[in-house]
Swiss-Prot record:
Residues 80-93 have a biased composition (Low complexity). SMART domains: Tankyrase_bdg_C. Residues 95-104, 198-207, 283-313 have a biased composition (Basic and acidic residues). This is Uncharacterized protein KIAA1671 homolog. Residues 29-136, 188-313 are annotated as: Disordered. Residues 62-77, 105-120 have a biased composition (Polar residues).
């Protein structure tokens, strides 16, 4: 690893270290009464003139400027001397800020010279802190080996092939099967006939071979159709004899159908649905009630019937 030397950073760190030393080496102030503190407001932080006399590197801002600004705000606007003082104050404040900046820069320069003297080596100017001549060498990248991703590519291809495909239609299967059969037949013929051909025989033209093949296919188709037509259903029996026997059976069964159908009829009356109940008629109800009822009820009922009939008439 190469380390770069940054003088500015070192100067800043040295400056902070000096400030910390000053903070810890200061003597604690003596205990004073509150009256003395009130009478001496600027003695705690120090006035501007005292700080200017003392050559400290760090110059804090004096609170006297703030007190002057507060006093100017409190004064009424009608007073002329206050207006004059307000005009002169901004310039004095700007001069003080410029002076404090100059003093800080001088203190930083002093601290940098102290560091240079302690190291014993002369540092280059700040412009040459990062030399452009040194460039990083990236030649080691070419020496590295590239990862072999062929196995991953093969896995991806296999996963694509294993995906579920839609089933082929019946017509496509037939057409493909015929193509494969034709290819195999051509290869078998070419492989089996070339060994037994006689070179002295005359070769037939292509048209004659095609016509011979067409005639063979037509003959085979005709033979298959004739054989399918001539195949009997019951071998060893004539069609005419079978037809005559079937006609006789139909004629004998046609007049005997009603007689044969009668014994199969059930004498029981057809009932409705198995879940339905048939209510008894009114006459049956009256007969049952007459059988169970006493004599005086029977007489009353007979009288009611007679009166009912008379009213209807």
């Amino acid at each position: 690893m190469e380390y770069y030397y940054c003088p500015r950073l070192l100067k800043f760190l040295q400056y902070l270290w000096d400030q910390l030393k000053q903070c810890f080496t200061r003597q604690p102030p003596e205990a004073k009464d509150t009256d003395t503190l009130v009478q001496e407001p600027d003695s705690q932080y120090g006035t501007w003139s005292e700080q200017r006399r003392s050559g400290d590197s760090f110059v804090p801002e004096s609170p006297s400027s703030e007190n002057d600004a507060i006093s100017t705000r409190k004064q009424p606007p009608n007073s002329q001397p206050s207006s004059l003082s307000s005009q002169t104050e901004p310039t004095s404040l700007a001069d003080r800020c410029d002076f404090s900046k100059d003093q800080r820069s001088t203190s930083l320069d002093r601290s940098s010279t102290d560091i240079d003297s302690t190291d014993g080596t002369e540092l280059p100017p700040p412009g040459d802190a990062y030399p452009d001549g040194k460039t990083t060498d990236f030649s080691f990248i070419d020496q590295t080996t590239i990862l072999d991703s062929s196995a991953l590519k093969n896995r991806v291809q296999l996963s694509k092939k294993r995906r579920h495909r839609a089933p082929l239609s019946h017509s496509l299967r037939r057409s493909r099967g015929l193509e494969y059969e034709n290819r195999f037949s051509l290869t078998e013929e070419s492989g089996s006939t070339w060994m037994f051909k006689d070179s002295t025989e005359e070769k037939k033209p292509m048209q004659q071979e095609d016509s011979d093949e067409e005639e063979k296919t037509q003959r085979s188709g005709r033979l298959s159709s004739v054989q399918a037509q001539r195949l009997p259903i019951f071998p060893g029996m004539d069609h005419s004899v079978l037809k005559a026997q079937l006609r006789k059976r139909h004629e004998s069964e046609s007049p005997g159908e009603p007689s044969s159908a009668q014994p199969f009829k059930s004498p029981k009356p057809q009932l409705g649905t198995p879940g339905s109940r048939i209510l008894p008629s009114s006459v049956e109800k009256e007969e049952r009630s007459e059988e169970k009822s006493p004599q005086w009820l029977k007489e009353l009922k007979s009288k009611e019937r007679q009166s009912h009939y008379e009213n209807q008439v």
